[in-house]
Amino acid sequence: MARLPLPNRDDPTLDAVEAAVENNQRSDVRTYMGWSGLGHPCERSVQYDFLMALRKTFKTSTLFKFEDGHGTEERVNKRFASLESLDFKPTGPDGHQWGVSSLGGHLRGHLDGVIKGLLQAPKTWHVYEVKCVADAKFRKLKRLVEEHGKDALEHWDEQYFIQAQGYMGAAEPQLKRHYLVCVTPGGREMTSVRTDFQPKAYKWAVEKAERLITQQELSPRISEDPEHFVCKHFCSFKDVCHSPQVSARVSCRSCAHSTPIIDDAAGAPGNVKRGAKWKCEHHDKLLSNSDQKRASPQHLYRPDMLGWAHPHQFNKLDNEITYRTDDGKEFTNCETADWKNKRFTSKDLQHLNAETMESDASYLDALSRFCPSAEIESRKKKVKPDELNDDLPSWM
C-alpha cells in the first residue's frame, strides 16, 4: 500500500511532497554483493541483500540524506577538479564509474574515482572516495586521524575500511593507497584520511564474501532480539529475518534450485557489466539477471528463506517440499496450487504465513491484496498457474 500523507505539521503540502518522494522511490534489487555492504556487522543481512530477499525501500528522511550525499559529492568533485596539479579521474575511459569485480563478478563495487598528485604523496595513485556524514561522525574522524594517522579509517568505520581494502585490492592494476574525503552535509567542512592497502585484510574480506556467496544456509543473526540496535536501525531485512509473517520475495536467488558459479573469466575487469553466473539445477540452464528477478513456475523456496516453517520432506521427482509450522501443521510448496489441500506455489507463499493459510477466507483475502483477480480465480478452478503466465523467463 502506498504511503498516505499524514498531518504531522501545519503544512499538508509538505507532507504530501514527502509522501510522493517515498512512494516514487526506485526499489530495484542489486544483482551482486557490494563491497560497500560486505562489512555490515550482521552476515545474514549481507546474504539477504545478495539473495534479493526484499526490494529495499527507505523512509523519506533517508532518501533526503541520499540526495544530500550525492549533491555534496558532486560539489567536492568540482573542487578537486579545479586544482590543475591533480590528475583526478572521477570516471573511467568509457565515461562511466570505475568498477571493480571479484569472485566471478559476484562481488563488485564502484569507485568515486582515482586520483594522483596529492601534495602529501604526489607520485602515487589513490582510490578516491567521498563520504558525507553527520557533524558528530565528522568530528570523530578528525580526532581519530590525529590519534592513529593512516590507521584511523579502521577505527572510525569498519564497513568503510573493508570497502577501501576491497577497492584497492580488486582494482586493475591493484592500488596501494586509498584517499577518503569526509565532508559535512553540504560540503561546508572537509577532512581526509589516507589508508594503506593491507593484503591480509583484503584476503580475509574476499574469503568472507566467498563463504557468504556459496554457503547453502544463512548465517546466524547478529541477535535474536529484533529490537537489537543493528536490527532496528541498520538493517533493511528485519521483517523477513525476524517476523513469522514475512517471507522472502520470489526470485531465482531465493530458490532451492539455483547455484552461484564463481567463474573468474566472468568477473574479469573487462567483463564487469556482463554479470556473474547463476545456474538453475532444475532446468540445467544459466540464468540471466532478468530471469533471476522473475523466477520460473518451478520455483521452490530455499527452506531458510521461508522463516515461519521448517522443511519436513523433499520430493525431487514431483518438485515439492513439505513443511511443518511450529504448531505441527503441514503444507507443501509445489508447482501447482491447490490451496484447499494446503498446496501452494512460491508466489502464494510469498504473501502468506502460518496464520493466513489456515482458512480459505483468510487465504483469499491475503492473496487478493497482491494477485490479479484472474489468478485468484485460477486457484478456485485449480488451473495451473503457468497457463496464465505470459511473462516467463526467456529460457523456459
Model-inferred region functions:
Residues M1-V127, A134-V145, D151, L349, ...:
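Metal-dependent nuclease catalytic cores that hydrolyze phosphodiester bonds in DNA/RNA
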Residues P5, K140-V145, D151-F161, G166, ...:
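Metal-dependent nuclease catalytic regions and adjoining charged, substrate-binding loops involved
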Residues L111, D196-F197, K279-L287:
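Secondary-structure transition/turn motif
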Residues G113-I115, W278-C280, H299:
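Short beta-strand element of the conserved SAM-dependent methyltransferase core
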Residues T124-V130, L175-L180:
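Conserved active-site beta-strand-loop modules that form the wall/rim of enzyme catalytic pockets
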Residues V130-C132, F237:
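Residues immediately flanking
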Residues C132-A134, T184-P185, D284:
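A short beta-strand motif that forms part of the nucleic acid-binding face
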